[in-house]
């Protein structure tokens, strides 16, 4: 009985390590990320691609109300997987830090600098009592002085830099597809195609344009740009990934 009570203390206490060195609440937050729909990031010499699966849970839901990719600054985009409300809080924090940097130094914030400020903020919530970890992972992508950068954050507050990465549901399958098909010399268009192929790789049906978000930050312009549904549809159609009417009827 006493052992069970001690186990529950480790389980519930965010600031208490278990005897084997684990923080259970942080691990549970990682499980929340796995339950979220996938987001994919691809870094190419021509820029960064962010793509997110945003298939709605019901045909009655407005697809435009589901946002998975956000603009943090003119040259930075953020994609999320996990609790949407937690993601919104972190994205707002990232936007504030970006603006503070512009006001203080008169220049855009660096991608690595912003990522570390966000992860420092996340990490504080793994050490403070009376709070819980953020149940979300982020992909922070952008261009800094002509160099594309792509980072992942996780609920522990650890940053990782990637060439291509997936977060959220089916991460293992998506990551396997990325590892098999990624090349260091990908163009930006090929990066978009790879991200869409990775998302589609875990679905028996095709992908609808309103079921996925895609954004890029070009190394040439250093500008965050979201693709329209028509542009996404053209990429899906060109790569034989577009959902047909038969697929949509099957889903329903």
From Swiss-Prot:
Consequence of gene disruption: Strains lacking psmA1 gene alone display relatively normal growth rate and overall cell yield, but they are more sensitive to growth on organic versus inorganic nitrogen sources and hypo-osmotic stress, and they show limited growth in the presence of L-canavanine. Abolition of alpha1 subunit synthesis also has a severe impact on the ability of cells to withstand thermal stress. Moreover, depletion of psmA1 and psmA2 together renders the cells inviable.
One GO cellular component term: cytoplasm
Example of a GO MF term: endopeptidase activity
GO biological process: proteasomal protein catabolic process; ubiquitin-dependent protein catabolic process
Regulation of this protein's activity per its record: The formation of the proteasomal ATPase PAN-20S proteasome complex, via the docking of the C-termini of PAN into the intersubunit pockets in the alpha-rings, triggers opening of the gate for substrate entry. Interconversion between the open-gate and close-gate conformations leads to a dynamic regulation of the 20S proteasome proteolysis activity. In vitro, the chymotrypsin-like activity of the alpha1-beta proteasome is potently inhibited by carbobenzoxyl-leucinyl-leucinyl-leucinal-H (MG132) and significantly by N-acetyl-leucinyl-leucinyl-norleucinal-H (calpain inhibitor I).
Phenotype upon changing residue 2 to D/P/T: Does not alter the prevalence of the alpha1 subunit in N-acetylated form in proteasomes. Renders the cells more tolerant of hypoosmotic and high-temperature stress than the wild-type
Induction: Up-regulated at the mRNA level during transition from exponential to stationary phase. However, at the protein level, PsmA 1 is expressed at a high and relatively constant level throughout growth.
Post-translational modification: Acetylated. The acetylated form at Met-1 was shown to be in 100-fold excess of the unacetylated form with the initiator methionine removed in whole cells and purified 20S proteasomes.
Comment on activity versus temperature: Optimum temperature is 75 degrees Celsius for the Suc-LLVY-Amc hydrolyzing activity (with the alpha1-beta proteasome subtype).
Major place of residence: cytoplasm
Residue(s) carrying N-acetylmethionine: 1
PROSITE patterns given in the database record: PROTEASOME_ALPHA_1, PROTEASOME_ALPHA_2
Pfam families linked: Proteasome, Proteasome_A_N
Subcellular location(s) per record: Cytoplasm
Claim: Ribosomal protein is one of the keywords in the record: no
Subunit structure: The 20S proteasome core is composed of 14 alpha and 14 beta subunits that assemble into four stacked heptameric rings, resulting in a barrel-shaped structure. The two inner rings, each composed of seven catalytic beta subunits, are sandwiched by two outer rings, each composed of seven alpha subunits. H.volcanii produces at least 2 types of 20S proteasomes: an alpha1-beta proteasome and a proteasome containing all three subunits (alpha1, alpha2, and beta) that appears to be asymmetrical with homo-oligomeric alpha1 and alpha2 rings positioned on separate ends.
Note: H.volcanii proteasome requires high concentrations of salt, similar to the extracellular environment and cytoplasm of this organism, for complex stability and optimal activity.
Functional description taken from the UniProt entry: Component of the proteasome core, a large protease complex with broad specificity involved in protein degradation. The H.volcanii alpha1-beta proteasome is able to cleave oligopeptides after Phe, Tyr and Trp, poorly after Glu but not after Arg. Thus, displays chymotrypsin-like activity, low caspase-like activity but no trypsin-like activity.
Family statement drawn from the similarity comment of this UniProt entry: Belongs to the peptidase T1A family.
Family annotation (NCBIfam families): arc_protsome_A (TIGR03633), PRK03996.1 (NF003075)
Listed PANTHER family: PROTEASOME SUBUNIT ALPHA/BETA
Name assigned to this protein: Proteasome subunit alpha 1
Naturally occurring in which organism (per UniProt): Haloferax volcanii (strain ATCC 29605 / DSM 3757 / JCM 8879 / NBRC 14742 / NCIMB 2012 / VKM B-1768 / DS2)
């Amino acid at each position: 009985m006493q052992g069970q009570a001690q186990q529950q203390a480790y389980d519930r206490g965010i600031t208490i390590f278990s005897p084997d060195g684990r923080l259970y609440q942080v691990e549970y937050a990682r499980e929340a990320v796995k339950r979220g729909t996938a987001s994919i990031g691809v870094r190419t010499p021509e820029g960064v691609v962010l793509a997110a699966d945003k298939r709605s849970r019901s045909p009655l839901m407005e697809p435009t109300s589901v946002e998975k990719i956000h603009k943090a600054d003119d040259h930075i985009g953020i994609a999320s997987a996990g609790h949407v409300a937690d993601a919104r809080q972190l994205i707002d924090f990232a936007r504030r830090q970006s603006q503070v940097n512009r006001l203080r130094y008169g220049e855009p914030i660096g991608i690595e600098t912003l990522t570390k400020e966000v992860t420092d903020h996340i990490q504080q919530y793994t050490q403070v009592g009376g709070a819980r970890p953020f149940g979300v992972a982020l992909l922070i992508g952008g261009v800094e002085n002509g160099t594309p950068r792509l980072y992942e954050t996780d609920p522990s507050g650890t940053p990782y830099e990637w060439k291509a990465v997936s977060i959220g549901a089916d991460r293992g399958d998506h990551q396997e597809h990325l590892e098999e098909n990624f090349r260091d010399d990908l163009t930006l268009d090929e990066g978009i195609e790879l991200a869409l192929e990775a998302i589609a790789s875990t679905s028996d049906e095709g992908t609808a344009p309103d079921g996925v978000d895609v954004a890029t930050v070009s190394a040439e312009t250093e500008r965050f740009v979201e693709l329209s549904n028509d542009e996404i549809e053209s990429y899906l159609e060109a790569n034989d990934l577009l959902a047909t009417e038969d697929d949509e009827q099957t889903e329903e």
